[in-house]
Structures are given as C-alpha cells and as structure tokens.
C-alpha cells in the first residue's frame, strides 16, 4: 500500500509495523491497534497483477466506471482547449463551432428531469461524504443504493436530500463504518427526523436487513477524538463485550453505551474525562452518558475510583 512510510513510528508503542484497513480507510498499528491515520486514499489500481503480462492486459486508459457520476463516467468530453491534435491553436469559425458543440454536449448529457435529478442527488452524496471524510468505496455503495431506490420508484414523492442521506447512512452501516444520524444530519439539508423516516422507508423498499450497530464499532473513533490511550480503548471494548454477553446492551443506543464505556475505562486507567467531553464526542446528552454509566457499573460490578 502506497502512503505507509517505512520511517513511521507508532506514538503509543514505538512499533514500525502497520496494517492498512481498506474498508475503513485507516492505517493501524499492528501491535497496539492505535489508528495512525484516517481517511487514507489508495491511489493504486483496483486490480492486482503478478507478472508483466497480466499488468499489460489489465492496465487501461481512462478513469474507471463509477456509480458516483450520473452516466457512470462512460461519456466523452470535448476538450475545453481550442487546440487540434497537433497542439496548434484553433481559430475563427472552427473555434466557434467547437464552442457550440460543447454547449450541445452539456445539454444532451442531462436531457431530461430524471437525469438532472440523479446528477443533483449524486453531487449531494459526494458533498456529504466528503464533509464526513468517508472513503471512496463507501460512496459507491451509497450511490448504488440510491440508484436501486430510483429504479424501484421509491424516490417519488420524497425529497432527494432525504433519500440521499438515507442511502449514505445505510451504506455506512453496511460497510461497518458507523456514523450516527446526528452526524449525517449535520452535513445534510434535511432534519435527523426526516433522514430516519427516509432510511426506514428505503430499508423496507429495498429489503435491507441490516444488523444493529454494535457499540464496540464506535469505541476507536470516539476514543481518538477524546485523545485517550490504546489501553483505555481496549478496556472500553472489554467492558462492552461483557455487557453484550449479559444482555445489558439490548434496546439501548450504541453511541450512548460506547460513550459510557469509554468514560468508565478512562477513569479506571487514570485518564479522567468529564461526562460533557464524552457526550460531545458521541453526540449524546450528558444524561445519557450518566444513565448508561450507572447501569454498566452496577450490573457489571465495576469498582470505579472516585
């Protein structure tokens, strides 16, 4: 994987061994699990070659097909530079003709309402994913979900922004890169309530059977935002694993549980964080952190130092 420098050293344990997680776009320390870098973009080809012959066969010119462009990136553009094949400047009536051709090409590419709506939806999806710093493959999954919803006519009568937000939220859950509804709403043009409604409608319409998000999936991201050690994150995961085994987490929000487990783990490891700090990172209220904290401490019999 390009981008992992051999001179890089883990700031926690001093290791120089790292693992690249392509699903999450993260570089992680192989020994302690500390996230060294997030949102890493793999700029290499999506194919692999083990000999020169394979490389020659699989290499190709042009950008790969993508669901993130309304025509899947299969169209060809007339070059914006007024030059011929030899690099000479085109002048006079030929230049005017080229300009008219470009204008008609733009019009013909998006020539009906459905195409315009799809182009707008995918541009919104790209904007939101960029603001949330989500990896490219996740955007492709979200675009695929949105296109399926269009084909099944689920978009009719609903806001484009709401359904795009729902597709992005569903893609995050499918790919194991959890983002809360609050986080999606923070970059969307519609409310959290509308995103939730649109998501449930899309899930029913497309038959998406997504498992509930585990609170453990939020620990690393929340822990990094709080600046706690790898030990604290590991302890928080142990607390949550035990809580899941005993059925304590059933029916409770995963973000609140992750926040409470991190709060407890930080206290146990001597890295005290306030309930307000933890609540802000997890996008929950201090009351939620406090309630989940009490439940975990009491039901797991944890002795927390005061």
Swiss-Prot record:
One of its GO terms (molecular function) is zinc ion binding. It comes from the Archaea. SMART domains: CYCLIN. Keywords: Metal-binding, Repeat, Transcription, Transcription regulation, Zinc, Zinc-finger. The keyword Transcription regulation applies. Belongs to the TFIIB family. Stabilizes TBP binding to an archaeal box-A promoter. Also responsible for recruiting RNA polymerase II to the pre-initiation complex (DNA-TBP-TFIIB). This is Transcription initiation factor IIB 2. It comes from Thermococcus kodakarensis (strain ATCC BAA-918 / JCM 12380 / KOD1).
């Amino acid at each position: 994987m390009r981008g992992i420098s051999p001179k890089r050293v883990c700031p926690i344990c001093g290791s120089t061994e790292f693992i690249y997680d392509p699903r999450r776009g993260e570089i992680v320390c192989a020994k302690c699990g500390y996230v060294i870098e997030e949102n890493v973009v793999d700029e290499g080809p999506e194919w692999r070659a083990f000999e020169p012959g394979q490389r020659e066969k699989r290499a190709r010119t042009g950008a790969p097909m993508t669901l993130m462009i309304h025509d899947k990136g299969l169209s060809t553009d007339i070059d914006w530079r007024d030059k011929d094949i030899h690099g000479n400047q085109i002048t006079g009536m030929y230049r005017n003709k080229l300009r008219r051709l470009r204008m008609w090409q733009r019009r013909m590419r998006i020539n009906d309402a459905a195409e315009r709506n799809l182009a707008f939806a995918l541009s919104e999806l790209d904007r939101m994913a960029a603001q949330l710093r989500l990896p490219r493959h996740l955007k492709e999954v979200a675009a695929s979900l949105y296109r399926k919803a269009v084909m099944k006519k689920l978009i009719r009568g609903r806001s484009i922004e709401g359904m795009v937000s729902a597709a992005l939220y569903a893609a995050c859950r499918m790919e194991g890169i959890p983002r809360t509804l609050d986080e999606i709403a923070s970059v969307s043009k519609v409310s959290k309530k509308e995103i939730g409604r649109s998501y449930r409608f899309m899930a029913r319409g497309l038959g998406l059977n997504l498992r509930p998000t585990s609170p453990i999936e939020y620990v690393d991201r929340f822990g990094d935002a709080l600046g706690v050690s790898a030990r604290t994150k590991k302890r928080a995961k142990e607390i949550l694993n035990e809580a899941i085994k005993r059925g304590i987490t059933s029916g409770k929000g995963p973000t609140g549980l992750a926040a409470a487990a991190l709060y407890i783990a930080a206290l146990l490891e001597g890295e005290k964080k306030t309930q307000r700090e933890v609540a802000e990172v997890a996008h929950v209220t201090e009351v939620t952190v406090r309630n989940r904290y009490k439940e975990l401490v009491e039901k797991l019999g944890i002795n927390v130092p005061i």
